[in-house]
A protein has these predicted regions:
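Conserved acidic catalytic loop of the alpha/beta-hydrolase fold
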Residues: 217-222, 232-250, 263
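Conserved alpha/beta-hydrolase "acid-adjacent" motif
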Residues: 422-428
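Gly/Ala-rich beta-loop-alpha elbow adjacent to hydrolase catalytic centers
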Residues: 253-262
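Short, surface-exposed "cap/lid" segments of acyl-processing enzymes
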Residues: 131-135, 139-218
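Active-site nucleophile elbow and catalytic-triad environment of alpha/beta-hydrolase enzymes
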Residues: 381-405
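Alpha/beta-hydrolase-fold enzymes
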Residues: 2, 10-111, 247-248, 261-376
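Catalytic active-site module of serine/aspartate enzymes centered on a nucleophile-bearing elbow/loop
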Residues: 431-494
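Short beta-strand/loop motif that positions the catalytic acidic residue
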Residues: 409, 415-417, 421
Length: 494
């Protein structure tokens, strides 16, 4: 007991440090979420005044909100119970170590000091998020990238190899990476310096690799007014540019919403002369199979729009991001996020590394507004399924888009999905396959992990993007980089 009394000033100081750091961390998470919620409330009030919901719609919203609140509360209670139990166990052990003067174990003062250090690391983690800025994603202002072309809506940058001794090979098919409008482009670059970049995994094999970047929607009126037809027309222009430069048809490589848009553009027949290969990563081909999103109440688009100073309306990125957080509210509510960060700091001995900081930066800093017509198109794909004859629920240039036309258009489709993806579930990503009669058109590949695993860990030993691997079902698969190289080799023989 004398040992505890002797260390009491240190224990009290550590307790105060712990409490202050916990308060800072929880306040930061609450403030970040509340900011998005206040923006959502402001938009909803304006929409309710101009175009009010029906009583039935209002009741559905209230019921959905109740379900979200219940899910968040349940997750918080479960997480907090586990955390408190672990803390009591460790504190009790430290207490008895102190009483018995056990020098081999941690005493109360050491336990409290360690907990305070961990909590301060959590509270100060935003510093790591800011510090990773110059390493995260594409740094288009550097010599590692070249502006290849520009349209009203898009910038096309070439991604140059970072691997020593590798040069761009003109004998390989060129590729355009198409990110989703909503999540931004930088997740495709992630951490090039750490060899964790999906884009550079292609470039470092000598593949002529390009990335399509949406211009700043806040300053570019053409972007604000972009619709799916515009996207297709301008994508054709980009492909024509690369075909003229490299002498081969282009591979479109789309991620998430970007993959769906690439599929639409190809099925329209507009790209027949310039594109013959499609790669999609975790693309929501039939959003009705994603219960997390399709199960959300349907509201008219006034409830997601923001009016810019020039009078144009766009889909608010903060509101759409908040909707995605609600989908995963059991992991995304403020208390659970703080407790998860505590567990991470403990597991990594307060050194979680650059990957975690980069992921947080992507989630917090990459929210952008969307062209309203693009948002409407995406919304429709989660509300209406592919028809019984294979037609997508959306059209281009007023014409239907049938997935079975891929074979007629001579397009090969490499389609991958994430086994543990709860946003774009495997059935959601593979829904079109049953309608495609030619079994040589689609190559369907399962990857371990969640929604962005292939982007943040492209060289995972279990499923390297540039090699072959065996899935849990015993089937041998190849990664998308290997697929692109093989397709290039096949094309060269013709």
């Amino acid at each position: 007991m004398q040992a505890i009394l002797k260390d009491l000033p240190d224990i009290a100081t550590s307790w105060l440090r712990y409490t202050l750091a916990l308060t800072r961390a929880t306040n930061r998470e609450h403030a970040e979420m509340n900011d998005s919620m206040m923006i959502a409330a402001q938009i909803a009030l304006q929409a309710a005044r101009d175009n009010p919901m029906s009583l039935m719609e209002t009741m559905e919203i209230l019921q959905h909100n109740q379900e979200i609140a219940g899910k968040a509360t349940s997750a918080s209670q479960e997480k907090l119970t586990g955390y408190v139990y672990d803390q009591i166990q460790e504190a009790t052990q430290a207490f008895f170590n102190t009483l018995s003067n056990n020098t081999e174990g941690e005493n109360v003062a050491g336990f409290m000091r360690r907990e305070a250090d961990i909590m301060e690391s959590v509270a100060n983690f935003h510093e790591q998020i800011e510090k990773i800025k110059d390493e995260f994603g594409f740094q288009f202002h550097t010599s590692g990238y070249k502006l290849a072309h520009e349209t009203d809506t898009f910038l096309l940058y070439q991604v140059l190899p970072t691997k020593s001794g590798v040069k761009v090979r003109d004998d390989l098919k060129p590729m355009i990476l198409v990110p989703p409008y909503m999540l931004g482009v930088h997740i495709l670059g992630f951490l090039p310096g750490e060899n964790k970049s999906y884009a550079h995994s292609f470039a470092n094999e000598g593949i002529p690799t390009y990335v399509r970047v949406v211009k700043d929607i806040m300053t570019n009126e053409a972007v604000q007014k972009t619709n799916p037809d515009d996207d297709c027309t301008q994508t054709k222009e980009l492909c024509e540019k690369l075909k003229a430069k490299h002498g081969q048809k282009v591979t479109l490589n789309g991620t998430c919403q970007g993959g769906y848009i690439c599929l639409m553009n190809i099925l329209s027949g507009t790209l027949t002369d310039v594109c013959d290969t499609l790669i999609t990563n975790v693309a929501p081909i039939d959003g009705t199979y994603s219960e997390a999103i399709s199960g959300m109440p349907q509201m008219h688009h006034d409830f997601i729009t923001t009016t810019l100073p020039n009078g144009n309306k766009v889909a608010n990125g903060y509101l759409l991001s908040l909707g995605m957080r609600f989908v995963a509210i059991d992991r995304e509510n403020p208390l659970v996020k703080v407790l998860d960060q505590i567990s991470l700091q403990k597991a990594t001995e307060q050194n979680p590394g650059k990957t975690v900081a980069a992921l947080f930066r992507w989630l917090l800093k990459e929210r952008v507004h969307l062209p309203l017509e693009i948002a409407k198109m995406s919304s429709l794909t989660f509300q209406q399924p592919i028809s019984i004859n294979g037609d997508l629920p959306v059209q281009l240039y007023g014409k239907p888009l049938n997935v079975n036309d891929l074979g007629k258009l001579g397009v090969k489709w490499y389609q991958n999905y994430a086994i543990k993806d709860d946003l774009v579930t495997p059935p959601c990503a593979t829904a079109a396959n049953r309608y495609i009669k030619d079994n040589k058109v689609v190559e369907c590949v399962p990857f371990p992990g969640g929604h962005v695993a292939i982007l943040t860990s492209p060289y995972n030993k279990k499923s390297p993007v540039n090699g072959e691997f065996t899935g849990k079902d015993g089937t041998k698969y190849r990664g998308p980089v290997k697929f692109q190289l093989d397709v290039s080799a096949t094309t060269a023989k013709k």
